[in-house]
Amino acid sequence: MQKNDDLLRERRKDEHVALGVKQNEQLAPSSLDDIQLIGTSIPRYNVKDIDLTTTIFGVNVSLPFYINAMTGGSRHTKKINADLAEIAREVAIPMAVGSQSAALKNSSLMDTYQIVREVNPSGIIMANVSPEVAVQDGLRAIEMLEANALQIHINPAQELVMQEGDRSFSHWLARIEEYVKRSPVPIIVKEVGFGMTRETVKTLREVGVETVDLAGKGGTNFAQIENDRRRDQAYDFLLDWGISTGQSLIDMQHIDAPKIAYLASGGIRNPLDIVKSLALGADSVGMAGQIIYSLKKDGVSNTIEKLELWKEQLRGLFVLADAKNIAELKETSLIVNGKLAEWGNVRGIDLVQLANRK
């Protein structure tokens, strides 16, 4: 029985990657397209003046983007994690691994995650567990990678579509609070592509969580992945569940939104999406599906070159936004249009204030 469970988990990991890569073959429209930064025609800064450094979970990092959680737990995904770690090392960005549940249940799979630390010994690495994982096991996940932080992924929609998924969730909040109290490293609670409302973030803040990853709809769709894995595909009506990255970011502009550090991810396509997310308060921006798609299509070296180009493009966008650093970018005026404006209005967001921040 244990062997069958292990094989099922390994197969699921491989299917997640294959289906996720397929989803990212074409860039979909994004809610971030409804955001327009108000720039300048007479910049105060030169490109060389721009400071892209940021702070996430108390750690200073040189760039405001990172490789988000995606994979690990099978022989195939070990090679992917090794390649992602090389990219993270060469570009000097943090990275997260996918859920480590497989390795916690089967120690022979630990190396599919530990390869990340082997390839990137001095990098910033985030471990990853579900709130289903007991705290003592979550601490093992941290030790497994000598991790700098721990992501706890919350994914009720994915679990419900997954035939073998969890069906009990009421204990999650207490488990997260226990992690906050006992973890030797910072905790990041993240969605997996269904977004967080300010109410969800407030609930997490009340149990001591200091950083969340909003992880909105628009990138890798795990409801679709799990539905595609089902023979009956019985949950096709749930494929549009959740709120987008743009909606999550706009929701955090509400006057009653909790004071908390937040990261943005979900459907990030280019440097402009990163800048818009930072302007709406994110401290850094995560990418998973697009990075793995680029890795599969173009290889490690070309993906590194692409992200190195993004660094220069980000500096240019900061110049156009008349912002020397992320703190100034967060004060840049921006217009919210279209369906995203409709969302903001009915959620009580002061969009006029956002359009006249400086």
Curated annotation (Swiss-Prot):
Chain sites annotated for binding substrate: R12, K13, Q158
Keywords recorded for this protein, A-Z: Cytoplasm, Flavoprotein, FMN, Isomerase, Isoprene biosynthesis, Magnesium, Metal-binding, NADP
Positions contributing to Mg(2+) binding: E159
Record-listed FMN binding positions: A69, M70, T71, S99, N128, K190, T220, G267, I268, R269, A288, G289
Enzyme class: isomerase
GO-annotated biological processes: isoprenoid biosynthetic process
GO molecular function: FMN binding; isopentenyl-diphosphate delta-isomerase activity; magnesium ion binding; NADPH binding; oxidoreductase activity
Entry keyword Magnesium: yes
Single GO cellular component term: cytoplasm
UniProt cofactor(s): FMN; NADPH; Mg(2+)
Compartment list: Cytoplasm
Reaction(s) the record says it catalyses: isopentenyl diphosphate = dimethylallyl diphosphate
Main location: cytoplasm
EC number, UniProt record: 5.3.3.2
Protein family (similarity comment): Belongs to the IPP isomerase type 2 family.
Known function: Involved in the biosynthesis of isoprenoids. Catalyzes the 1,3-allylic rearrangement of the homoallylic substrate isopentenyl (IPP) to its allylic isomer, dimethylallyl diphosphate (DMAPP).
Quaternary structure note: Homooctamer. Dimer of tetramers.
PANTHER family xref list: ISOPENTENYL-DIPHOSPHATE DELTA-ISOMERASE
Protein name: Isopentenyl-diphosphate delta-isomerase
Organism classification: Bacteria, Bacillati, Bacillota, Bacilli, Bacillales
This protein's encoding gene: fni
